[in-house]
Amino acid sequence: MGMYKYIREAWKSPKKSYVGQLLKQRMIKWRREPSVVRIERPTRLDRARALGYQAKQGYIIVRVRVRRGGRKRPRWKGGRKPSKMGQVKYSPKKSLQWIAEEKAARKFPNLEVLNSYWVGEDGMYKWFEVIMVDPHHPVIKSDPKIAWIALKHHKGRVFRGLTSAGKKGRGLRNKGKGAEKIRPSIRANEGKGK
């Protein structure tokens, strides 16, 4: 087996391999860090490479922490029955991974999100690493594999649900019978697709 296959096998079931112990130590440190942190190199090299990361100028890795659970809605100031306050049982209709990608994009507005992957979780948080690309960097513009991201119609792609996590959240992995209300978009079908 090659190096990447060993890494992939270890991450398939982290608790059973050496990854579990490493994650425990890492998360103690990660909890103290800000929610969005730029890092030097990917934690899961195999996953990052599979999703398009290259170790060259113009590629940036960002680790993002997202709170687990449903959506935390703002609390009303006026009087209401507790059951009518609209505090519980509301979900954001987006995966936590998609939310993490958006957080990274807001922190680094000059970069575009390429993709992301899971790196850890505990009872309170989930961590994702987001691969970001500088569309104005000459190295990126001259690489035919990634130069497409510099085109103007890819600007703000994460906020339009065009990343892998975004497309999954919009139901675009499904086609055929049962997926009639998914395309062209959820909104075009008056929200009936979700």
Curated annotation (Swiss-Prot):
Highest taxon listed in the record's lineage: Archaea
SUPFAM superfamilies assigned to the protein according to its UniProt record, in alphabetical order: Ribosomal proteins S24e, L23 and L15e
A GO term, aspect molecular function: structural constituent of ribosome
Extent of Basic and acidic residues compositional bias: 177-194
GO cellular component, one term: cytosolic large ribosomal subunit
Keywords recorded for this protein, A-Z: Ribonucleoprotein, Ribosomal protein
InterPro entries listed in its UniProt record: Rbsml_eL15_core_dom_sf (IPR024794), Ribosomal_eL15 (IPR000439), Ribosomal_eL15_arc (IPR020926), Ribosomal_eL15_CS (IPR020925), Ribosomal_uL23/eL15/eS24_sf (IPR012678)
Keyword Ribonucleoprotein in record: yes
Region feature (Disordered): 164-194
GO biological process: cytoplasmic translation
Ranges of biased composition (kind: Basic residues): 167-176
UniProt xrefs under Pfam families: Ribosomal_L15e
NCBIfam families: PRK04243.1
Family recorded in the similarity comment: Belongs to the eukaryotic ribosomal protein eL15 family.
Cross-referenced HAMAP family: Ribosomal_eL15 (MF_00256)
Protein's UniProt name: Large ribosomal subunit protein eL15
Organism of derivation: Pyrococcus horikoshii (strain ATCC 700860 / DSM 12428 / JCM 9974 / NBRC 100139 / OT-3)
